Amino acid sequence: MKFGISIPVTIGEKWKEKLLECLPQIEEYGFSSLLVWDHYMLPEKYGVKSNNTIDAWTLLSFIAANTTKIKLGTCVTPIPFRPPQLLAKIVSSLDNISNGRVILGVGAGWHKPEFDAYSSWDNNKIRFEKTAEGLELMKKLWTEDVVNFNGKH
């Protein structure tokens, strides 16, 4: 059995120093993975202001630079939130930087205000279609030298 740890993308006073203090312990204690939330905004009930979050993939790059063995990834990255070809580049870049330590958790997204602010909101059916199509394109971009792709979305 493997155990992972999840941390939020919220930032506050001395967040970098606190995180840097914890990272060696996380690896030392034998956690197999460290996952972060992939959100730019959180529901108000969580008590986090939008300007107190950091981009998940930027945070993971910071963590990769300060760790050596723990797997890194997102709890859930909503595929419809970003263009899939951009997400494929972001993920493969981090995988390269971290020497193959990336885990990509995916989903269709759920927080409408976040999509409204940073992307575009679609109904569940469309978001699930975009997720499946985006994954198909991303896999091709990672495994084929030349990609021709004509998706519905």
Descriptions of predicted regions:
Residues 3-7, 34-36, 71-74, 102-106:
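Hydrophobic faces of well-ordered beta-strands that scaffold small-molecule active sites
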Residues 39, 78, 108:
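Residue-level "edge-of-site" marker
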Residues 61-65, 71-80:
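Structural motif corresponding to the early beta-alpha repeats
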Residues 42-47, 83-153:
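Internal, glycine-rich beta/alpha segment that forms the wall or movable "lid"
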Residues 1-11, 69, 110-115, 152:
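N-terminal small/glycine-rich loop or linker at the start of catalytic domains
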Residues 5-17, 75-85, 121:
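Active-site mouth loops of central-metabolism enzymes
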Residues 1-66:
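N-terminal beta1-alpha1-beta2 module of alpha/beta enzyme domains
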Residues 29, 65-70, 137, 141-145:
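A structural motif corresponding to the C-terminal end of an alpha-helix
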